[in-house]
Amino acid sequence: ATGKSAYATKYNNVYGGRTNPNWALCWNNVAQAALLYSPNSSKKSVFVENQSGLIASKTQSGDNNFCLIDSWGSARYNTAHQMTGLLYDTIYGKNDYSSWANGQMKYILGNNAGSKCFVVGYNKYSSKYPHHRASSGYQGSVTVNAYTKQAHVLVGALVGGPADSSTSYVDSSEDYNQNEVALDYNASLVGAAAGLYLYVKNSGTDEEKAAQKVVPKSEVSSELRTI
């Protein structure tokens, strides 16, 4: 991008010999993003090997083909993998992962066997008990309050997601594996959503395009407006 060879040299010193990281983009492993933007075209094949390899090896065929990369924060890793796939398609003018990402996001939002949505406040299927002290308003042990109505709705927060399948997912603030929320979780959600907005705008069905709209202020809760 800069035309300065020093950056390419530095990159090759760090990632030149990098092989398949066999993991999704996350806060402590950015290899997949580095491979995606590599100045060395041969590294593109390593990116594809990792992207496609995880999809092939981690997909749950019995649960709407959800790609469950890890049982702790599965939705976080899934949306991160959506995002890198969408970036690849955008950068290289392909359509290798966009349709897959679209299906995975539908799963995240509730189109799954358990009818569970892993984005708080998104629809009637949304998780109601995220593992988040400030939004819960709980006083005392989270174990005692695990299913107590929370003081605030943490609208738009991505919870951890299923440890096994959508049908066995437990919506409990006590379960930090499945209901924890974090900044890196939402970073991948927003990144994937942005990529899918562009994908649907260009290649989506009429129904999908019609669903893309700016939410009017009248439909936004007063609590959300004050955040």
Predicted regions and their residues:
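Short glycine-/Asp-/Thr-/Trp-enriched loop segments that recur within the blades
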Residues: 65-66
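Aromatic (Trp/Tyr) and acidic
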Residues: 1-6, 10-17, 21, 25-60, ...
